[in-house]
Amino acid sequence: MRCQRCGNEDMNYFYQDEGVWYCRKCIGFGRIDVGKEPITRPCMRRRCKCHYTLSYPLTPKQQIAVASIMQYLKEGKDVLVYAACGAGKTELTMEAIQWYLCQGKKVGFAISRRQVVLEIQERMQQAFPMLQVIAVCEGFTDITDGDLIICTMHQLYRYHGWFDLLIMDEVDAFPYRDNALLEAIAM
């Protein structure tokens, strides 16, 4: 037996209810019966003629990093940006976000902490004023779709199969680090 949401195969986490088995490892994200795929809701997709603006220029090294990121993404490769806190990693993602949205693709930005979700949402809304930038975290779950979705790692369960580009920040921090359940939901 295998859960299609979290990948659990440990029988200790399965329970049978009226002849139907379901996974208890990820029950906090809603019940999913064995053999069923996570629910995929339709999402808004529109080709945006968006352009981001920053109130300051990127440094020459940041511009080189952006060019490398874009080269890898256009080749269909995953990218890891490893830099110190405050080095401008969020700004390095904006070119990629713009490129994907202009093609009508769906973009998500996941981060571990609620407060940072709200901060990133505000920064992205300033950089992309013509877009609907949505924050999805504790206390902000009424609207869950927009042009650009900024959410906590825990909220990724809502977006199974949605994102063409998923930017994950602070993957080395609690609660994502060493959490197999959140890793499975994100992938």
Label the predicted regions.
Residues 54-77:
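N-terminal pre-P-loop "Q-motif" helix
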Residues 74-96:
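Walker A/P-loop
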Residues 105-113:
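Conserved RecA-like ASCE P-loop NTPase motor core of nucleic-acid helicases/translocases
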Residues 113-116, 142, 156-158, 172-174:
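Residues immediately C-terminal
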Residues 158-187:
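SF2 helicase catalytic motif II
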